[in-house]
């Protein structure tokens, strides 16, 4: 049985820009909290980054549920493309960046989010599925890959991956899609 839902499912405020500012503030609070968690060494840098990834990814994944227009989410993405670029360039917000390797995920994620919201906003279910995969499968693959032997490593461009991490990404993605 195929069915379609009407989006958004919930409008927290009459004006969408209030929702935008609440989400923006929430994301900034999460980033600041991650800095504190990193300084207090409550989590390892990679675990801290994964937790931030999941929380912020969940916020943006839910954007079609709380916004009628792609404009507020696209604006949010644009703001974080700029903020993440400057934070990365100036070695700020280490709680959201990988500590052990050079990665650009914190810059690529909002770029991908921007493209998806602008180009595919009318395909809400696909947007939610694709963002869910990025939000959930990526940190699971990272965790599995880091906690397995290095005997099964391979390199894509300059990134080292493991067969186990790749399998975890595939399995998680399959579960999300179906």
What residue ranges belong to the model's regions?
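Interhelical loop and helix-boundary elements at the membrane-water interface
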Residues: 4-22, 32-72, 84-177
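Glycine-rich nucleotide/cofactor/substrate-binding loop typically near the N-terminus or early
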Residues: 77-83
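Glycine/aspartate-rich loop-and-adjacent alpha/beta segment that forms the canonical ThDP
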Residues: 26-30
